[in-house]
C-alpha cells in the first residue's frame, strides 16, 4: 500500500512524519490516520508537528496500515511477542502475531532474545504485519557478541540499531535515559532494575565505568532514525518492578533525563514516545501520568500496565489492566499488554489472546471516560441487541465474539436458543429484560401519579 507513498522519499536526509508536519505537509500517512480516527487531517498534522502524536511508519515497512499514538487519538494497545533461548520458533511467533492482530493489537513488539535467528524472525514478522513493529535493539547487540558485556562496543549498538531500521522496524525502545550517576539511586529497592535493556546497560556501565553509550551517542542515533522515519520509544530502565519501588528517586531522575532526550530528538525532527511503569499503586497512577506529561512536554506516554498489586501471579493481565484503564483515563496514549504468564514464563498464543482482550477492555474504557468521539457507540449497539435478545448481534459486537458464543453455548447450544428471550442464568421465567416496560407505559404511569394524591400511592 505504501510503496508509491514513500518512493520519492528514499535517499532523503530526513523522512520523518514530524519533519513533514513541521513543514505544513499532510502526508498520505497523516491522511490515512485522520480517516481511521475520524479526525481532521489538519489536526493530525498539527498534533504530529507539536510532538503530541506519533505515526510510527518506517519507509521500509511497505505493508503497514498507518496508525496514530497520541492523546488526540484513541487509546492504543501494544502486544509483545518474541522467542527466547528456551522456547518458540519463527512459526510460533507468526502465529502469535496473527492472533495479536486478530484481537486488535495496534502495534506489536518483537522482543526475541535468542534461540532463533533474530534477523529471520524479525524480518518475517515485519513482512507479515499490517501494524507497526517495535523492537529493543540492545537484546541483539548483546547476542551479537555472544553475551559478553566486556566485548560490547558503542559501535555494536549503533550497528544493530541501523540494521533494525533497514529491516523496517517502526519504533525502537532506546534506553538512553539511564545515566551512570543514576545507578546508586537504585540502592534500597526491593527489586532493583527489572528492565532487561536497562539491566544490560547497567552492567555495561559498571564494567566499563563509562556513560551509557545510548546517551553519549544519542545524536548519532537520531541521524540514523531520521533516514528511515523510525520513532523513538524512550525506554524506562528504572521503572519500578514492585509497588515498594514506585515513584522513587531513581525512577523520577531517569524520567527527567527522558524529557531532555525528547527535546533533543525533536530538535532533529524525530518522533518520540516515552515509556513508563510498571508496578504502581492506584493512588500514584495519576501522579505518574501528570509527571510524565510535565517532564516530557506532553510527548505520548506508553506504559506497561501498570500492575496495581504484586500478589497475583497467573492473573497479572487483570492486576495490570486495572492500572492500565486508569492510566488511559488520565491521558496515557498507549498501553503495553501484560499476559497471564507475566513473571512466570514465555506467553503462548492463548496467553496473547487473554492479555490482549484484557487490554482492549482497558483502552476502550479509557476512551469512554475521556469522551472520545464515538467511543461508546459500540456499547450502545450491544446494549440494544441485548435488550432485544439478538444473541448473534451481541456476539458480533463483542471484543471476543468466539468467547462470548462459547460461553453462551455451553448450556444452551441449540440454534433455537439464539432467538430465546433468556439465557441459562435466569431461565425462561425470571429474566428482567422480558418485562419490556415501554416509554408509553411510563408516560401513562406519570399521568396516573399526577392525577392522584401522592400520599395515597405511597410516594
From Swiss-Prot:
GO molecular function: 4 iron, 4 sulfur cluster binding; carbon-carbon lyase activity; zinc ion binding
Residues reported in the UniProt entry to bind substrate: 80, 109, 139, 175, 195-197, 236-239, 275, 302
Listed GO CC annotations: cytosol
Cofactor(s) this protein cannot do without: [4Fe-4S] cluster
Listed PANTHER family: PHOSPHOMETHYLPYRIMIDINE SYNTHASE, CHLOROPLASTIC (PTHR30557:SF1), THIAMINE BIOSYNTHESIS PROTEIN THIC (PTHR30557)
Record-listed Zn(2+) binding positions: 279, 343
Keywords: 4Fe-4S, Iron, Iron-sulfur, Lyase, Metal-binding, S-adenosyl-L-methionine, Thiamine biosynthesis, Zinc
Family per record: Belongs to the ThiC family.
GO biological process per UniProt: thiamine biosynthetic process; thiamine diphosphate biosynthetic process
Iron-sulfur is among the record's keywords: yes
Pathway as given in its UniProt record: Cofactor biosynthesis; thiamine diphosphate biosynthesis
Entry's transmembrane regions: none
Protein name, as recorded: Phosphomethylpyrimidine synthase
Catalytic activity entry: 5-amino-1-(5-phospho-beta-D-ribosyl)imidazole + S-adenosyl-L-methionine = 4-amino-2-methyl-5-(phosphooxymethyl)pyrimidine + CO + 5'-deoxyadenosine + formate + L-methionine + 3 H(+)
Cofactor binding note from Swiss-Prot or TrEMBL: Binds 1 [4Fe-4S] cluster per subunit. The cluster is coordinated with 3 cysteines and an exchangeable S-adenosyl-L-methionine.
Biological role: Catalyzes the synthesis of the hydroxymethylpyrimidine phosphate (HMP-P) moiety of thiamine from aminoimidazole ribotide (AIR) in a radical S-adenosyl-L-methionine (SAM)-dependent reaction.
Top EC category: lyase
Species for this entry: Prochlorococcus marinus (strain MIT 9211)
Amino acid at each position: 500500500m505504501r510503496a508509491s507513498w514513500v518512493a520519492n522519499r528514499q535517499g532523503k536526509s530526513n523522512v520523518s512524519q514530524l519533519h513533514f508536519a513541521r513543514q505544513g505537509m499532510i502526508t498520505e500517512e497523516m491522511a490515512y490516520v485522520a480517516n481511521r480516527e475520524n479526525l481532521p487531517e489538519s489536526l493530525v498534522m498539527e498534533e504530529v508537528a507539536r510532538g503530541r502524536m506519533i505515526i510510527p511508519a518506517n519507509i521500509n515497512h511497505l505493508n503497514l496500515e498507518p496508525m496514530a499514538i497520541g492523546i488526540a487519538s484513541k487509546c492504543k494497545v501494544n502486544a509483545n511477542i518474541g522467542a527466547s533461548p528456551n522456547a518458540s520458533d519463527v512459526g510460533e511467533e507468526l502465529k502469535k502475531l496473527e492472533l495479536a492482530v486478530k484481537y486488535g493489537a495496534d502495534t506489536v513488539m518483537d522482543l526475541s532474545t535468542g534461540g532463533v535467528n533474530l534477523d529471520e524472525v524479525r524480518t518475517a514478522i515485519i513482512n507479515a504485519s499490517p501494524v507497526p513493529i517495535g523492537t529493543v535493539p540492545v537484546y541483539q547487540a548483546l547476542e551479537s557478541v555472544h553475551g559478553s558485556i566486556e566485548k560490547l562496543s558503542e559501535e555494536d549498538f549503533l550497528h544493530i540499531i541501523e540494521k533494525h531500521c533497514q529491516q523496517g522496524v517502526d519504533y525502537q525502545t532506546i534506553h538512553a535515559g539511564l545515566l551512570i550517576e543514576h545507578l546508586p539511586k537504585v540502592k534500597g529497592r526491593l527489586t532493583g532494575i527489572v528492565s532487561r535493556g536497562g539491566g544490560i546497560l547497567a552492567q555495561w556501565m559498571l564494567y566499563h565505568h563509562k556513560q551509557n553509550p545510548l546517551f553519549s551517542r544519542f545524536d548519532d542515533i537520531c541521524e540514523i532514525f531520521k533516514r528511515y522515519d523510525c520513532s523513538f520509544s524512550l525506554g524506562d530502565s528504572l521503572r519500578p518492578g514492585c509497588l515498594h519501588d514506585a515513584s522513587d528517586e531513581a525512577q523520577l531522575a531517569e524520567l527527567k533525563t527522558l524529557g531532555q532526550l525528547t527535546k533533543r530528538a525533536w530538535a532533529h525532527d524525530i518522533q518520540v514516545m516515552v515509556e513508563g511503569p510498571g508496578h504502581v499503586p492506584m493512588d500514584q497512577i495519576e501522579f505518574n501520568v501528570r509527571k510524565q506529561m510535565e517532564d516530557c512536554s506532553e510527548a505520548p506516554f506508553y506504559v506497561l500496565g501498570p500492575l496495581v498489586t504484586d500478589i497475583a501471579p497467573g492473573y497479572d493481565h487483570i492486576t495490570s489492566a486495572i492500572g492500565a484503564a486508569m492510566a488511559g483515563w488520565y491521558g496515557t496514549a498507549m498501553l503495553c499488554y501484560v499476559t497471564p504468564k507475566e513473571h512466570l514464563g514465555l506467553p503462548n498464543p492463548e496467553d496473547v489472546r487473554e492479555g490482549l482482550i484484557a487490554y482492549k477492555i482497558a483502552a476502550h474504557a479509557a476512551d469512554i471516560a475521556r469522551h472520545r468521539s464515538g467511543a461508546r457507540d459500540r456499547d450502545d449497539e450491544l446494549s440494544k441487541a441485548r435488550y432485544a435478545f439478538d444473541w448473534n448481534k451481541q456476539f458480533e459486537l463483542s471484543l471476543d465474539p468466539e468467547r462470548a458464543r462459547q460461553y453462551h453455548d455451553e448450556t444452551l447450544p441449540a440454534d433455537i436458543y439464539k432467538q430465546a428471550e433468556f439465557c441459562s442464568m435466569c431461565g425462561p421465567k425470571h429474566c428482567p429484560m422480558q418485562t419490556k416496560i415501554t416509554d408509553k407505559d411510563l408516560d401513562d404511569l406519570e399521568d396516573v401519579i399526577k392525577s392522584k394524591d401522592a400520599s395515597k400511592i405511597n410516594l
